[in-house]
């Protein structure tokens, strides 16, 4: 496959030909970054079957091509297959996945793979990429789709952050309000009021150091009460992955500070 669309600003035939190129875009999520040659099977460039002699020669070329690939390349291929599977389940955009692949390549270059599973490291890289791009996905979300224990994922994430000196910002709590409310099909007014509650909490400086998901769930719970939507704290706990005790404590603090509801 070749990308033959124009990608330059050549305004004469000579300048256009100097700047022109063909070929698909490269990607960090490919084990070879999309730069290697792929040997086709049993058909020529026009789609016609090739002769038995040519088929035998190409089979030998294909065999040696596979043998020449390093263990590192094979490892990348397996890791990025896992990454694409997680991307599909989590509904994450390509630029975040590219970022995750970049982080994972740095993990391999730093030789952090010893004693750690590939699935956990690729999942930790994906979580770090989500944090860098403020995509609201929790450790529990990543652990679930990656079929990994949360404590193992958390441990490997701490290692990656420390060794690679990543500077991950805290999540924007408002993004979790949108995520939880959409998943629970809450009314638009309930969501808007939850944003207002969050804004008031930030002005009162009671959000610092608090779990953003718990803060979002508590704001939505209070907003539901104000708008007559009867949803239990237990349901919010299940949907957000936060214990109902934590949500109850956050709700109590918000009610006491803002005096919104009795």
Regions from the PLM with identified roles:
Residues 1-262:
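Non-catalytic, interaction-prone regions of core transcription and DNA-replication machinery
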């Amino acid at each position: 496959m070749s990308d033959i669309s124009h990608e330059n600003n050549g305004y004469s035939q000579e300048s256009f030909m100097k700047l022109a190129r063909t070929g698909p875009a490269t990607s960090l999520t490919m084990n070879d970054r999309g730069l290697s040659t792929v040997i086709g099977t049993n058909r020529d460039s026009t789609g016609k079957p090739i002769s038995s002699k040519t088929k035998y020669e190409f089979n030998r070329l294909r065999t040696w091509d596979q043998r020449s690939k390093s263990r590192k390349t094979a490892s990348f291929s397996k890791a990025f297959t896992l990454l694409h599977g997680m991307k599909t389940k989590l509904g994450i955009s390509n630029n975040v996945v590219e970022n995750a692949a970049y982080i994972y390549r740095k993990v391999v270059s730093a030789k952090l793979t010893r004693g750690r599973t590939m699935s956990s490291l690729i999942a930790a890289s994906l979580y770090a990429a989500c944090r860098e791009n403020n995509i609201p996905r929790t450790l529990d979300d990543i652990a679930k789709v990656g079929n990994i224990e949360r404590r193992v994922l958390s441990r490997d994430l701490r290692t990656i952050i420390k060794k690679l000196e990543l500077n991950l910002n805290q999540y924007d709590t408002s993004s979790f309000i949108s995520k939880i409310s959409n998943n629970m099909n809450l009314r638009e007014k309930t969501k808007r009021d939850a944003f207002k509650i969050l804004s008031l909490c930030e002005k009162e400086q009671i959000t610092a150091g608090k779990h953003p998901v718990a803060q979002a769930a508590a704001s939505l719970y209070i907003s539901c009460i104000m708008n007559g939507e009867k949803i239990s704290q237990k349901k919010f706990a299940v949907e957000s992955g936060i214990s109902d005790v934590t949500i109850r404590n956050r709700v109590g603090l918000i009610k006491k500070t803002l005096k919104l509801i009795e």
